[in-house]
UniProtKB/Swiss-Prot annotation:
This is Tryptophan 2,3-dioxygenase. Keywords: Dioxygenase, Heme, Iron, Metal-binding, Oxidoreductase, Tryptophan catabolism. PANTHER family: TRYPTOPHAN 2,3-DIOXYGENASE (PTHR10138:SF0). Pfam families: Trp_dioxygenase (PF03301). Its EC number is 1.13.11.11. Pathway: Amino-acid degradation; L-tryptophan degradation via kynurenine pathway; L-kynurenine from L-tryptophan: step 1/2. It comes from Xenopus laevis (African clawed frog). It catalyses: L-tryptophan + O2 = N-formyl-L-kynurenine.
Length: 406
C-alpha cells in the first residue's frame, strides 16, 4: 500500500539569494522599534487596563456566571463610548454656531463634516443591534433578573444627546407618569437641567436660517415673489381646467387644484404657522422655514450648496435616531415580550410610544417636500442676488445683519 500520493515524488525547492537590487527594494523590515526605547505605548494611551477590565458580570458575582451577559455589557459600553463621541462632535458644532464662527464660510465645511460624522456613528449604532440580536430571548432571560433596577432609560448621555439636539421637553412621553429627569439624582439631574437651558442645535440652526440672504423684503424678497408665482400658476391651471369638457377626471383635477390652493394658503399664513408652532407640530420659526425652503429651491447656487448639505445631514440624524429607537423597540419586544422593563417602565409599550414625530427635531425639514413646485414657478434670481449667491466668500456677510458685523 502506497503512502501519501502527494509525496510519491520528492520535490526539491531551491531558494535563490535575493539579488542586490531586490535587497534594496525590500524595505519592509527597515523600520525602528521605537517602543523598545520606552515612552507612551498603545495600551497606556488608550488606558486599556481600565476599559478591558470594566466588564463585571452580575451573574458571576452571584455565583451563576452566564456567558451572554458579557456580550450584553460590551455592547452597551460600546454604545456609551459612541454616545460620548457624538456629544463631543455636537458640542463643537454648537460652539461654532454660538461663537459666530459660522459667519466664516470655511467653518461651514467643518460643521457639515462633523454633523456627517454624527450620522455615520448613528448608522453604526443602528447596525450594532444585529450583534446583540445573536443572543436569544432565553439567553437574556438567564441573567435579566440580575440587572434590576438598572435600565437603558438611565443612560445619561442619550438624554443629554436628545436635549442638545433639541427634543422639546413638552413633547417627551412621560416615564411612568413622571418627568424624565426624576429618574436621575444629584449631579446627573443637574447636568440634564443645564442641557435643557443651553442653546440647542435646533435653536442655533433656526437663528442661522433666519439670516438667509434673499429673504429681505427690501431686497430680493423671495417669499413675496414665491407666493405671487404659485397662486398665479394655480389660478391659470384652474381656469384652464374649467374650460375642459365635463368628466370625472375634470372634477378630480379641479378638486386637486383646490387642495393645492388651500395647502399653499396655509404655508403663506404666518398666524397659522405660529398656531402649529404652539401645538408642537412645527419646530422652526416662520422666518427660518422661509430660509430653509429658499435653500432647497436654490441649492445649486454655490453659496447654498454647503447649507443644503447641512440641512440634508440634519434630516439624516433624525432618520437614524428614529431607526435606532425602532430597532431598540423591536429587540426589546423580541427579548421580553410585553413584560415590564427592568427599571419599572411598561417596557415595549413605553418604548413604542417614543417612535413618533414627537421625538423628531428637524421634522419641518422633512415637510419641505410638501411645498415643492415646478422649477418654472420658482422666482428667477435677479442679477444682484445671483451674483451674490454665485460667489462664496471667506467672511460670509450674508448670514448676519450689518449691525452685527465688525
Amino acid at each position: 500500500m502506497s503512502g501519501c500520493p502527494f509525496m510519491a515524488k520528492k520535490h526539491h525547492f531551491t531558494f535563490s539569494e535575493l539579488s542586490l537590487e531586490d535587497k534594496h527594494e525590500d524595505n519592509s523590515q527597515e523600520g525602528l522599534n521605537k517602543a523598545s526605547k520606552g515612552g507612551l505605548i498603545y495600551g497606556d494611551y488608550l488606558q486599556l487596563d481600565k476599559v478591558l477590565n470594566a466588564q463585571e458580570l452580575q451573574s458571576e458575582k452571584k455565583g451563576n456566571k452566564i456567558h451572554d451577559e458579557h456580550l450584553f455589557i460590551v455592547t452597551h459600553q460600546a454604545y456609551e463610548l459612541w454616545f460620548k463621541q457624538i456629544l463631543w462632535e455636537l458640542d463643537s458644532v454648537r460652539e461654532i454656531f454660538q461663537n459666530g464662527h459660522v459667519r466664516d464660510e470655511r467653518n461651514m465645511l467643518k460643521v457639515v463634516a462633523r454633523i456627517h460624522r454624527i450620522s455615520m456613528i448613528l448608522k453604526l449604532l443602528v447596525e450594532q443591534f444585529s450583534v446583540l440580536e445573536t443572543m436569544t430571548a432565553m439567553d437574556f432571560f438567564d441573567f435579566r433578573d440580575y440587572l434590576s433596577p438598572a435600565s437603558g432609560f438611565q443612560s445619561l448621555q442619550f438624554r443629554l444627546l436628545e436635549n442638545k439636539i433639541g427634543v422639546p421637553e413638552i413633547l417627551r412621553v412621560p416615564y411612568n407618569r413622571r418627568h424624565y429627569r426624576d429618574n436621575f439624582k444629584g449631579e446627573t439631574n443637574e447636568l440634564l437641567l443645564r442641557s435643557e437651558q443651553e442653546p440647542t442645535l435646533l435653536g442655533l440652526v433656526e437663528a442661522w436660517l433666519e439670516r438667509t440672504p434673499g429673504l429681505e423684503e427690501e431686497g430680493f424678497h423671495f417669499w413675496g415673489k414665491l407666493e405671487v408665482n404659485i397662486f398665479r400658476a394655480l389660478e391659470e391651471e384652474l381656469q384652464a381646467a374649467k374650460t375642459k369638457p365635463d368628466s370625472e377626471d375634470k372634477e378630480e383635477h379641479l378638486a386637486e387644484l383646490q387642495k393645492q390652493k388651500e395647502l399653499f394658503g396655509a404655508l403663506f399664513d404666518e398666524r397659522r404657522h405660529e398656531h402649529l408652532l404652539s401645538k408642537g407640530e412645527r419646530r422652526l420659526s416662520y422666518k427660518a422655514l422661509k430660509g430653509a425652503l429658499m435653500i432647497n429651491f436654490y441649492r445649486e447656487e454655490p453659496r447654498f450648496q454647503v447649507p443644503f448639505q447641512l440641512l440634508t445631514s440634519l434630516m439624516e440624524i433624525d432618520t437614524l435616531m428614529t431607526k435606532w429607537r425602532y430597532n431598540h423597540v423591536c429587540m426589546v419586544h423580541r427579548m421580553i415580550g410585553s413584560k415590564a422593563g427592568t427599571g419599572g417602565s411598561s417596557g415595549y409599550q413605553y418604548l413604542r410610544s417614543t417612535v413618533s414625530d414627537r421625538y423628531k427635531v428637524f421634522v419641518d425639514l422633512f415637510n419641505l417636500s410638501t411645498y415643492l413646485v415646478p422649477r418654472h414657478w420658482v422666482p428667477r434670481l435677479n442679477p444682484s442676488i445671483h451674483k451674490f449667491l454665485y460667489t462664496a466668500e471667506c467672511c460670509d456677510s450674508s448670514y448676519f445683519s450689518s449691525d452685527d458685523s465688525d
